[in-house]
UniProtKB/Swiss-Prot annotation:
PANTHER family: ELONGATION FACTOR P, TRANSLATION ELONGATION FACTOR KOW-LIKE DOMAIN-CONTAINING PROTEIN. GO terms for biological process: peptide biosynthetic process. GO terms for molecular function: translation elongation factor activity. SMART domains: EFP (SM01185), Elong-fact-P_C (SM00841). This is Elongation factor P-like protein. It comes from Aliivibrio fischeri (strain MJ11) (Vibrio fischeri). SUPFAM superfamilies: Nucleic acid-binding proteins, Translation proteins SH3-like domain. Belongs to the elongation factor P family. One of its GO terms (cellular component) is cytoplasm.
């Protein structure tokens, strides 16, 4: 059993007799000398989809839930449901738009490297690759010779994501975006 300080974003844990998927973790360090470091976790109940915020002391022991990862690709949208197809056995996995709203900013039909997390036979979350290639649909005109400066400008991708890009990048270009930091990495 790992300690709360060892739990990472994207883990499936057992808490109060239920299985939760950890979406966010923030570390709270009290200013007093005797205060213990707390880890605040935003979690989603796998069975109901309800949100829960819990705080754990750094040395609290937490049970990890059994889960598996399956390689998948985005297939199609059916109303409010997004359908992903297993890359090996073509099993469809449905997700409600609200459950994967943040991940949708990085997913296009060409996105490779998606992983579906499965707990008790049910899909609970999508794990993004570390970087994705997205096309810019709206940004200020590129400035010739701007490659020497480190200035940036906002650019909107086809998915609706807005990131800061160097001034020499133009509309229609494909760029590589870091999915954890939401930052421009390079041209694709």
């Amino acid at each position: 059993m790992p300690k709360a300080s060892d739990i990472k974003k994207g883990s499936a844990i057992e808490h109060n007799g239920k299985v939760f998927f950890v979406k966010e973790i923030s570390k709270l360090t009290p200013s007093g000398r005797a205060g213990a470091t707390l880890f605040r976790m935003r979690m989603y109940d796998v069975a109901t989809g309800s949100k829960a915020d819990e705080s754990f002391k750094a040395d609290d022991m937490i049970n990890l839930a059994d889960f598996s990862r399956r390689s998948a690709t985005f297939s199609y949208v059916d109303g409010n449901e997004y359908v992903f197809m297993d890359s090996e056995d073509y099993t469809p996995y449905n997700f409600n738009k609200e459950a994967i709203e943040e991940e949708l900013l990085f997913i296009t039909e060409e996105t490779q490297g998606l992983q579906i997390l499965i707990v008790d036979g049910a899909p609970v979350a999508i794990e993004l690759p570390s970087a994705v290639d997205l096309e810019i649909v709206e940004t200020a005109p590129s400035i010739k010779g701007a490659s020497a400066s480190a200035r940036t400008k906002p650019a909107t991708m086809t998915t609706g994501l807005t990131v800061q890009v160097p001034e020499y990048i133009a509309n229609g270009e494909k760029v590589k975006i870091n999915t954890t930091e939401h930052k421009f990495m390079s041209r694709a």
